[in-house]
Amino acid sequence: MPSIILYCSWNQDRGFLSIGSENGYQVYRSNPFTLCFSKKANGASICEMLYESSLLAFVNISPESTRLLKLVDIKRDIVLCRIFYPSPVLSVRFTWNRLVVLIKGSIYVYNLKNMELINTLNTSKGNVIAFAVHENYVAYNSPTNPGDIYLASLDTAIPVTLIHCHSSAVQVVDFHPRGHLIATASAKGTVIRVITTSDGELVTELRRGYIPASIVSISFHPVEPFLACASENGTIHVFKISKQPSDPNSSPTSSVTVSSSWSKYLTSNVAKVWDTRKEFATAKIPEASFYGKIIFSSSGPHIQVASYSGHYYRFAVNLKNGGNCALLERYIFDD
């Protein structure tokens, strides 16, 4: 029997996958897919890895432990730091020099060198559902207008851009590895919008389908102009982003701006027709329903899948011709 997965996440360079389960946590190497580390514990609701280091951010599943974040050196098997929060930890992300922690109402930013609290972002008392971090910026949905995304500086704790993404609540947001784009999907799940982080302009709209289905994971290709998404029905759609922003190295500006791209989009039927693109390739996860994470591999034309059902899959993607993606590998996560 596969273990019941509670959390899964690839590290920043996509080389390792960390898994939290009812019985502890594991770390797997992506290529070739092999188990590197396993630890029996009282369950892990969050398990994040810092690049290829032995440092993991870890949260237990027991009710009394969900407010406690531990930084663990898994090689030496010691707890380096413990931080208590006023409410349960909802998400944790690493950058090369920052630790970012989300709880209800707040985002905490720490300096990784000394674990000094640098900034706290107030997200009000609403629920932050969509949350992503890239280098010096964090993206999260507006609790008051959940179809909007804020981009905020980790160094100043100031929102620099407000982007109108969807008419319904944003459910998933992801940064391009270079940070110049974000992709968003709403609870409806029929389209994914790709938007520049510098000025919030709409780059393209990618249509998953016309029947609503929850999109649970989005991933940009690290080099090529492709994006993949996985929905709750187990279908992976791969899109080619043929329209690229003019300045891929740009960053959000230092003052708050409100994107007008969404209003332009609504008032331009012509733009809606040519800017909506169908999938380039597809894959079918062999499960009746799916919840988990997908990611483009950094070591080849592959999509990797970690399912909360306790399974790992790897699909081949033909980046030249598209079409159906062949299932190359299947693995069951061990307890």
Curated annotation (Swiss-Prot):
InterPro entries: PROPPIN (IPR048720), WD40/YVTN_repeat-like_dom_sf (IPR015943), WD40_repeat_dom_sf (IPR036322), WD40_rpt (IPR001680). GO terms for molecular function: phosphatidylinositol-3,5-bisphosphate binding; phosphatidylinositol-3-phosphate binding; protein-macromolecule adaptor activity. It is found in: Cytoplasm; Golgi apparatus, Golgi stack membrane; Vacuole membrane; Preautophagosomal structure membrane. Coiled coil: none annotated. It holds the Pfam family PROPPIN. Keywords: Autophagy, Cytoplasm, Golgi apparatus, Membrane, Protein transport, Repeat, Sporulation, Transport, Vacuole, WD repeat. It is a peripheral membrane protein. GO terms for cellular component: cytosol; fungal-type vacuole membrane; Golgi apparatus; Golgi cisterna membrane; phagophore assembly site; phagophore assembly site membrane. Disruption phenotype: Impairs atg8-processing. SUPFAM superfamilies: WD40 repeat-like. GO terms for biological process: autophagy of mitochondrion; glycophagy; macroautophagy; nucleophagy; pexophagy; protein localization to phagophore assembly site; protein transport; sporulation resulting in formation of a cellular spore. WD repeats lie at residues 165-205, 210-249. Belongs to the WD repeat PROPPIN family. Required for cytoplasm to vacuole transport (Cvt) vesicles formation and autophagy. Has a role in sporulation. PANTHER family: WD-REPEAT PROTEIN INTERACTING WITH PHOSPHOINOSIDES WIPI -RELATED. This is Autophagy-related protein 21. It comes from Schizosaccharomyces pombe (strain 972 / ATCC 24843) (Fission yeast). The lineage of its organism: Eukaryota, Fungi, Dikarya, Ascomycota, Taphrinomycotina.
